[in-house]
Amino acid sequence: MKNSEKTLDMIVNLCKNRGFIYPGSEIYGGLANSWDYGPLGVEFKNNVKKAWMKKFVQESPYNVGLDAAILMNPQTWVTTGHVGNFSDPLVDCRACKSRNRADKLIADCEQGQNVDVDGMTFDQMDEFIATHPEVVCPVCGKHDFTPIRKFNLMFKTAIGVTEDSSSTCYLRPETAQGIFVNFANIQRTTRRKLPFGVCQVGKAFRNEITPGNFTFRTREFEQMECEFFCKPGTDLDWFAYWKDYCEKWLLSLGINKENLRLRDHEPAELAFYSRATTDIEYAFPFTDWGELWGIADRTNYDLGRHQEASGKSLEYFDPETNEHYIPYVIEPSLGCDRVALAFLCEAYDEEHLTDSKGKEDVRTVLHLHPFLAPFKCAVLPLSKKLGDKAMEIRNELAKDFMVDYDDAGSIDKRYRRQDEIGTPLCITVDFQTVGDDKVEADNCVTVRDRDTMEQIRMPISELKEYIAKKVAF
């Protein structure tokens, strides 16, 4: 099933009905664009994070991990420019009072498709909207907007018992700065030599004007970021290395290459401090292309700014050349929620089958990479009379894997339920497993493959090794 044949509604319905993702605070009417990961969703998302940490930290000879605080000294965000400049271009519709991002309005209109919105200033956006009546409000369809004004995306809060300017603090809008301010600590305590990287998975918060498309753009989200420090002059080589590394990670977890593209930023799109930026984009069902991963050569801008503002040296002493210099940084930045959504979109399939009697049926299946699947296997007793043996097998397997147990309904219906949530293997316990008056016990079970639906008979003693090989990454 091609992505062009899928819809966001298909993905959302499966997620809600099968316990992947629920609307946040639903019993109180919900909170706009707030989502809670359910029992299956939390396992799936944790597996996405594990897959990232495995390849970017555990198996990488260069990188180490970090878990920095969400709340940071507010001077951090003054130094980085977030307090003054981290904003979106906001316009109000005078007719219906709805609020919209000006750049999105321009990009969404037919004549705006070939316009380089990312390279436009606020004044240029204002002029474009004023001179193009086809830019209309998505709510009421009118062309009647206020001038653009800056809308700061940071969530402001207060620390302590009183609220004044001295207690102002912010929920971090990105995880990267926690890495930069800890650069000297990490380099000193790990005794790392350049090049090396620091990886972090954590929550970030942005007060988006127009969040939407399920978990694609939300105000609370999780990032998986790497800040890779290298010697100036080697940065473009490392930039190419991490572009290739990131794309291979996606492909190795089941993303089809035809659903990915690498888009290099034009010079007008680049931040003034960036030498190069490439977005890895995915063909989501609800848009032509949506950004998954940003890989940027940030030069020495971040460390340089923090050194200047803090008065603390963030230079690196190179023992090979006896030089002191501020390292350059390559930043591969990935949204965990967004890439998890891409994996769901990629894996979703509706297969049209015909049974032995000629009856047509539709099988909904998630072809998730087994490492990402919430459950690695499901134990299914053919009869509830076999529950004791089935539960014994389940409990033993659960020491090493996430295992589901289902004894309700026909075996075919139970297979379909597991297909729909992406369980790679179903283990059926039958009367031959335990034996009875008519058949001798063989201590074997039937193992069914999710993708091929093929079944094999296997000794219980070989299950763990078989499952481990099937779900390896």
Task: Name each region found by the language model.
Residues 1-473:
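NTP/phosphate- and nucleic-acid-binding module
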